[in-house]
Amino acid sequence: MCPGVSSYVAEQLGLRTNAFLQDLVGLGCGAAIPTLRAAQAVLAANPNAVVACVAVEVCSAAFYLDDDPGVIISACLFSDGAAASIWRSTPGPGGWRCHGFDTLHLPADRDRLRFEQRDGKLRNLLDPAVPQLAAGAVSRLFGAAQAQAGVRPVRRIIAHPGGRDVLNALEAALPEYPLAASRRVLRDFGNMSSPSVLFALAEAMRDGQPDENGDWWLVSFGAGFSAHACRFGAA
């Protein structure tokens, strides 16, 4: 999409004409957490800035049908959605912070999850190995997060609700962390791609919020194949 979504968002919000706009594309379902990481970098360079992060996907624009099982699953699974958050370098009372960002790239598995062009349309490639691939990548990132020194323990995992089999594989890999919020989002909204993990975060916060006794751990994954994670906790 050119110009990007940020151009239209800035116009509708009436932002000043010299506001810095940046569109991150090509990251698929995993994009929300890298966007938060980009916001962290902007705030580090400009401590007085206010950053709006928007994750928006119109999966219905890539609707395609044939008899391939991956295509059929994609047509049943994916949906449209958007989520947004506002960030500052200094949180207010009762605020939260994202930190401890990490990423894992697995380019050897790039072709297991991607778009291709077919008859002038976007056709989703969804390999049956994706659930186990996601679980393996998430396990590696979580191991690295657990090894970090001087951080709070992880009390809850908020995962991208990529599908039933994906969530089953994640819970099998990390059985101490049930993914109830992610399952509710999948049930109610389907897989909205990048906004989904933020929907799961909002859903989890209906049950409670992280505090000084422990962080939540957000994780998403998608095209590349790549996985991304960060800690979310009380400031």
State each model region's role.
Residues 17-19, 45-51, 72-73, 81-82, ...:
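Short coil/turn connectors at secondary-structure junctions
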Residues 11, 18, 23-44, 135, ...:
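Claisen-condensing/thiolase-fold acyl-transfer catalytic domains that form or cleave C-C bonds
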Residues 25, 50-57, 79, 87, ...:
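Short beta-strand segments
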Residues 44-54, 59-72, 224-226:
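Phosphate-binding/catalytic loop of phosphoryl-transfer enzymes
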Residues 7, 103-107, 164:
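Short glycine-enriched loops at secondary-structure junctions
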Residues 5, 31, 35-39, 47, ...:
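Internal, well-ordered alpha-helical segments in soluble enzyme and binding-protein domains
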Residues 63-136, 140-143, 221, 233-235:
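Condensing-enzyme catalytic core mediating Claisen C-C bond formation in acyl metabolism
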